[in-house]
Amino acid sequence: HVDSFLAQHFPRGTGFATDLPAPNDSGDLPLATVRAFSIDDSATTEIDDAFSVQALGERVRIGIHIAAPAVVLARGHAVDTIAKSRMSTVYAPGLKYTMLPDAWIESLSLNEGRELPVLSLYADVDAETRDVLSTESRLERLRIESNLRHDRLDAIVTDTTIAEAQFDSPYAEPLSTLWHVARKLLASREQARGRPEPAGRVDYFFELHGTEE
C-alpha cells in the first residue's frame, strides 16, 4: 500500500532537490510585544502555532499566532511550486513526508528564542464574563518565549489545578485564562446548537521507534 501511495502522490520521489534557495528575511514586519508560547507534544518538530495572553485592566487580550511561511515565499518560487504540488505534509504511523524541505521547516518553525513571521488573531475578552468584545488580525513578527510540551504538563495539569492556575509553571496564569475562555466558547456553541458537543472521546497518541517502514 505504501508503494502504491507513493507512486500516485510522489511520482518524482519524496525527497527534495539539494540546491533550493533559503527563505528570505522577514525583518520588515513589525515585532509583536507579547509573551508567546506554543503547546505541542515532545515529538513535534514543526511548530506552527502559538498563543499569548495579555492582561489589560478589565480586558484580556488573547493572541492566536499561526506560522506564515508565505511571507518569505514569493509566488512562483521553486519551493512555492513544490508546496503547491504536495499541498500538505503526509502523516501516517511511522511515516512523515513534509510539504516543505527540512531547511525551510527549521527556519520557519516557531522554536523558542526566535523571531518569525506569523498571522496573528487577537481577541479582547471581558476579564470577568470572558465574552469576546473585539477581534483584530495582524501580519507581524513574533518572538517565541517558550515551547511547552503536553507530556511534561499532563501530570500536573488537571481541571482542578488549571481552573485556579495552581500548578508549577510560569505559564499557569495564561494557560488558566485560555482554559476558561475555551470553556466559555464551548458553552456558547452548545447553546447555539441546542445540544452539548460530544464528550468522552479518547485522544490516542502513538509513538513509534525505529526506521523500518
PLM feature spans:
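Boundary/activation segment at the start of structured domains
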Residues: H1-F10
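Short, flexible coil/linker elements and helix-boundary hinge sites characteristic
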Residues: F10-P11, G27
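Electropositive polyanion-binding surfaces
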Residues: F16-E213
